[in-house]
């Protein structure tokens, strides 16, 4: 059940077009899906050191969200890349911070030791995918996912079509706020519609082999009973039921997606407002009553 929410008449898009939202971190499950497709084809080993997958190394961009500024980069030490794998990046156990905007990329702890949410890990994974496929993320996602599923209103960077149909995001006070990504950021630059994202989730839920990779041996999220993290998705295990879920939070937008793994019922909720997370949570609970301890994490705001 896809749900899109806008605040007022000024949020309407031109007649005859789809209402496109910025999905923020709902990009991460899509990138995980693309990554696991390569795993199932034998083109990627989840436990192979990243250093072996990036023969030319990795240059971390510190000012990633300064979209109009020249890049400020640092080369990540090879010995650090040797400790990282696609599995640790997908499960947020890499030890990388969420973001490192003011200095070189460094580990907070030894990879695999614990869970810590990391956008930087998915940006690194984006470079791995580019190296393995020879395609930038937008092209790879289009060929592998968007075109086959008919996701006509989804992209990892701004295009003329996206710009025409993009719902204006809003601050809590109602001011228009949104980012227009001229390049792909695997962690957060997805543009899509609720219906497109629901189709993506349906494809995932129908793919038992890939779904089993997502949910196998998840890691516990600290101080969050019954909440775990798999490969690309959060996992709740409550009252003999299991759910996968993720949220998105970015300038002007909030979003949530959840699916019941027992019934395969799913909900996607987008809000074009920075105070829209309570609305998104209420939409989730209307269809999937819960309880949902994952939605109580401090990150999900």
Predicted feature residues:
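Catalytic loop of the DD-peptidase/beta-lactamase superfamily, centered on the K-T-G motif
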Residues: 1-4, 18, 22, 113-114, ...
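Short, solvent-exposed loop/turn and secondary-structure capping segments
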Residues: 1-3, 99-103, 157-158, 280
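Active-site-proximal loop and beta-strand segments within enzyme catalytic domains
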Residues: 5-120, 133-135
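Well-ordered alpha-helical segments within folded domains of soluble proteins
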Residues: 30-32, 121-126, 195-199
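Short, mixed-charge aromatic SLiMs
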Residues: 56-64, 145-155, 220-225
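Carbohydrate-binding/catalytic loop surfaces
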Residues: 74-81, 160-186, 234-236
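Generic structural signal for secondary-structure transition and capping sites
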Residues: 94-98, 150-154, 209, 219
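A small/polar active-site loop signature that marks catalytic segments
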Residues: 107-111, 115, 131, 150, ...
């Amino acid at each position: 059940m896809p749900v899109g929410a806008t605040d007022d008449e000024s949020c309407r898009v031109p007649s005859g077009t789809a209402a496109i939202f910025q999905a923020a971190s709902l990009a991460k499950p899509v990138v995980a899906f693309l990554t696991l497709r390569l795993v199932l084809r034998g083109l990627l080993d989840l436990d192979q050191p990243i250093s072996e997958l990036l023969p030319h190394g990795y240059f971390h961009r510190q000012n990633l969200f300064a979209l109009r500024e020249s890049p400020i980069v640092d080369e990540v030490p090879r010995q650090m890349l040797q400790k990282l794998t696609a599995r640790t990046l997908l499960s947020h156990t890499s030890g990388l911070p969420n973001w490192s905007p003011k200095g070189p990329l460094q580990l907070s702890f030894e990879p695999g030791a614990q869970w810590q949410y990391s956008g930087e890990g998915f940006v690194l994974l984006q470079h791995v995918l580019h190296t393995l496929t020879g395609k930038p993320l937008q092209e790879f996602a289009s060929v592998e996912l968007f075109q086959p599923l008919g996701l006509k209103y989804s992209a990892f960077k701004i295009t003329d079509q996206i710009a025409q149909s993009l719902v204006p995001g809003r601050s809590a006070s109602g001011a228009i706020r949104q980012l227009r990504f001229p390049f792909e950021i695997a962690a957060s630059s997805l543009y899509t519609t609720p219906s497109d994202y629901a189709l993506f989730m349906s494809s995932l839920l129908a793919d038992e082999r890939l779904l089993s990779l997502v949910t196998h041996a998840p890691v516990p999220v600290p101080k969050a009973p019954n909440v775990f993290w798999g490969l690309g998705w959060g996992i709740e295990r409550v009252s003999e039921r299991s759910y996968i879920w993720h949220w998105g939070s970015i300038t002007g937008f909030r979003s949530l997606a959840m699916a019941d793994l027992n019934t395969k019922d799913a909900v996607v909720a987008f809000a074009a407002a920075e105070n829209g997370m309570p609305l998104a949570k209420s939409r989730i609970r209307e269809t999937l009553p819960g309880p949902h301890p994952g939605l109580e994490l401090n990150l999900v705001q």
